[in-house]
């Protein structure tokens, strides 16, 4: 039983160490980009991209990173199961939404005009 808890403790320590490495890599990317601003921009950008990719790679090796990858795979599987609308259905729905929006805007414009005239009649102010 104690061997199992020791294994869990070292596993947690390893996880924490991985996250420390991730944060360190990101800090090196940020601080290095700031400190070496006299170096050519494409070279600095390449270094930042490499450091961020390395940080992402280390993050994917953690427990949360593996869970994120599993979630992404499941999400991709679910996206494949979706029955997407055809081009014609999408066009018809878009046209209906545009028409309803136009009608509602005209109704609201008319109501606004009526309310402005009503308020100006009551208050005696002319706009």
Swiss-Prot record:
Q: What happens when the gene is disrupted?
A: Essential; deletion experiments lead to loss of the SecYEG translocation channel. Leads to loss of translocation of lipoproteins Lpp and BRP and accumulation of signal peptidase I (lepB) in a soluble fraction.
List the ranges whose topology is Cytoplasmic.
1-19, 61-97
Q: Does the keyword Acyltransferase apply?
A: no
GO biological process terms held by the UniProt record: intracellular protein transmembrane transport; intracellular protein transport; protein insertion into membrane from inner side; protein secretion; protein transport by the Sec complex; SRP-dependent cotranslational protein targeting to membrane, translocation
Q: How does it sit in the membrane?
A: Multi-pass membrane protein
Question: What are the protein's GO molecular function terms?
Answer: protein transmembrane transporter activity
Q: What are the protein's UniProt keywords?
A: Cell inner membrane, Cell membrane, Membrane, Protein transport, Translocation, Transmembrane, Transmembrane helix, Transport
**The keyword Transmembrane appears for this protein:** yes
Subcellular location(s) of the protein: Cell inner membrane
Which regions of this chain are Periplasmic-facing, per the record's topological domains? 33-48, 116-127
Q: Which InterPro entries match?
A: SecE_bac (IPR005807), SecE_sf (IPR038379), Translocase_SecE/Sec61-g (IPR001901)
PTM comment: Degraded by FtsH when the SecYEG complex is jammed or upon treatment with antibiotics that block translation elongation such as chloramphenicol.
**TM regions (residue ranges):** 20-32, 49-60, 98-115
A Gene Ontology cellular component where this protein is annotated is:
plasma membrane
Quaternary structure annotation from Swiss-Prot or TrEMBL:
Part of the essential Sec protein translocation complex which comprises SecA, SecYEG and auxiliary proteins SecDF-YajC and YidC/OxaA. Heterotrimer consisting of SecY, SecE and SecG subunits. The SecDF-YidC-YajC translocase forms a supercomplex with SecYEG, called the holo-translocon (HTL). The stoichiometry of the super complex may be SecYEG:YidC:SecDF 4:3:1, YajC is in the reconstituted complex (with SecDF) but as no antibody is available it could not be quantified. The heterotrimers can form oligomers, although 1 heterotrimer is thought to be able to translocate proteins.
Q: What family name appears in the similarity comment?
A: Belongs to the SecE/SEC61-gamma family.
The family database entries (NCBIfam families) matched by this protein are listed as: PRK05740.1-2 (NF004372), PRK05740.1-5 (NF004374), secE_bact (TIGR00964)
What does this chain do?
Answer: Essential subunit of the protein translocation channel SecYEG. Clamps together the 2 halves of SecY. May contact the channel plug during translocation. Overexpression of some hybrid proteins has been thought to jam the protein secretion apparatus resulting in cell death; while this may be true it also results in FtsH-mediated degradation of SecY.
User: What's the protein called, per UniProt?
Assistant: Protein translocase subunit SecE
What organism does the UniProt record list as the source?
Escherichia coli (strain K12)
Give the classification, highest ranks. Bacteria, Pseudomonadati, Pseudomonadota, Gammaproteobacteria, Enterobacterales
């Amino acid at each position: 039983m104690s061997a199992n808890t020791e294994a869990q403790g070292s596993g947690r320590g390893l996880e924490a160490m991985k996250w420390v490495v991730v944060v360190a890599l990101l800090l090196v990317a940020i601080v290095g980009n700031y400190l070496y601003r006299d170096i050519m921009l494409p070279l600095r950008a390449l270094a930042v991209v490499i450091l961020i990719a390395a940080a992402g790679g280390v993050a994917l090796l953690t427990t949360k990173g593996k869970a994120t990858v599993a979630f992404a795979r499941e999400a991709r599987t679910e996206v494949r199961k979706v029955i997407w609308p055809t081009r014609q259905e999408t066009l018809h729905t878009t046209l209906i939404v545009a028409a309803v929006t136009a009608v509602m805007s005209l109704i609201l414009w008319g109501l606004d005009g009526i309310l402005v005239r009503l308020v100006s009649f009551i208050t005696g102010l002319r706009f």
